[in-house]
Amino acid sequence: MVHLAKYIVVTGGVVSSIGKGITAASIGRILRSYGLSVTAIKIDPYLNWDSGTLNPYQHGEVFVTDDGMETDLDLGHYERFLDSDLPGEANITTGKVYMSVINKERSGDYLGSCVQIIPHITDEIKSMIRKIADKSGAEVVLVEVGGTVGDIEGQPFLEALRQLRNEEGHENVMFVHVTYVPYLRAAGEFKTKPTQHSTKELRSTGINPDMIICRSEMPIDSSLKRKIAHFCDVEEEAVVNAPDASSIYEVPLVLDSERVGDYIVRRIELDVDGEADLSEWAGIVESLMIDEPVVTVGIVGKYVELEDSYISIREALKHAAAHLRVRVDIEWISADDAVNEEDLSRLDSILIPGGFGERGIAGKLEAVRFALENRVPIFGICLGMQCMVIEFARLNGMEGANSTEFDPETPYPVIDMMEEQKRIKNMGGTMRLGSYQCRIREGTLAHEAYGTELVGERHRHRFELNNEFREELESKGLIISGTSPDDFLVEMVEIKDHPWFLGCQFHPEFRSRPNRAHPLFVSFLRAALERSR
């Protein structure tokens, strides 16, 4: 039996970073509350094959999926809002599309045809979208088109999606256009002209939006909605206002109050019983809005100027705080600078996130030393764990201990590149990526947090604790609390006689959800709360 999905395509206009990803994720959350199965796709119109080699300052965090793909951070939003694990193929890039088409041409699949944008590229885009829809078995497929309408890079994707609507039927595909309605304080009024022009640009591609979601700093009134409906040729009830919210998790509630779910259900003829029920989600949002007690976490990182570089860590801390019914305040501390001990002393806890390269390592090591000497709860993730091992070794007689990533000639290479990684020359998609199992040692902080002996966590690294120094480090007091099931790779470390000192080689933040806070983050914040008291 052929799987027939309904498609909701989300495009953006006027400005970039308008919140298309949160909008798409919020629509998905609303549809989930009807009892519908939903999956999501992010289209990134850049020529990179994936997000793995992109600069965090330009693109934000690289989100790693269970199956080991390095993807756009919007997939993290989708997973958190939909509470489901997405495949890496749900991130479609121009690079993937072109590579697939060129490989097919080289293998003779096109039988000598002149390979063109239309039909070959557009057919490949549609094929990728349908493949994801079929494999997921979802009733609704959300497709977010990255960038802004009018970008030259996005034109083949918009054409493919226009064709998709014709082929699937207008009752099975709808377009949601997210725009910005600026407020001019000098004139004291909102301006709809940018939205009108953006919609006109979209219509010039052959796509008429079914719904327009207007982002704004403040709520807009019904007369403005009528004006936009009139000039943009959509129904008045399909003009939706999404003003700035205090939390991204409020957006599904805002859109639901605008009857977005009801309109979508009617527009693409979804088979549902009853109304959307977001009561559980509203409870989560209420927990996220708690004002006190407050715990302070200092994140010592090298990309702190752009918070999106650590977006999953930030959200995981919020989820854990909501679980404990506390508020978390995050202090962003640049590891590039000499870490000020006075600043650190005001913190309830310290978190050292992942990263690559030598820049900022000295600052991270200073933070580890401060946490050890002052008994401050500290959580190290990926490179953060490696820094904890390095500083622990140095403080316990292994002078000059380091990672071979930073000092190939170190006398104590306590962190070294994994053996199988040493033969790899290409950078893209070649690390230890995706979900791997970790066996947890009983009687440890990790076991207390997880409450189980075997867990699956997502990884993204080339370097590991060097087994040649494992026995020596353990003799000095380092506890290996988690390893690969074969006991070969060290996954987690702790020490005794410290309130909370734990490092993990994996990225637990990728598994945290608003309704299911990650146990390590909950345990970490609980220790921070104890210190704050």
Swiss-Prot record:
Subunit details: Homotetramer.
The protein, known as = CTP synthase
Boundaries of every Glutamine amidotransferase type-1 domain copy? 303-533
Pathway(s) annotated for this protein in UniProt: Pyrimidine metabolism; CTP biosynthesis via de novo pathway; CTP from UDP: step 2/2
Q: Name one GO cellular component term.
A: cytosol
Specify which residues bind L-glutamine according to the UniProt entry for this protein: 57, 355, 383-386, 405, 462
Under Enzyme Commission nomenclature, its number is 6.3.4.2
Reactions that this protein is recorded to catalyse: UTP + L-glutamine + ATP + H2O = CTP + L-glutamate + ADP + phosphate + 2 H(+); L-glutamine + H2O = L-glutamate + NH4(+); UTP + NH4(+) + ATP = CTP + ADP + phosphate + 2 H(+)
Looking up InterPro entries in the UniProt record yields: Class_I_gatase-like, CTP_synthase, CTP_synthase_N, GATASE, GATase1_CTP_Synthase, P-loop_NTPase
Catalytic-site annotation from UniProt: 382 (nucleophile), 507, 509
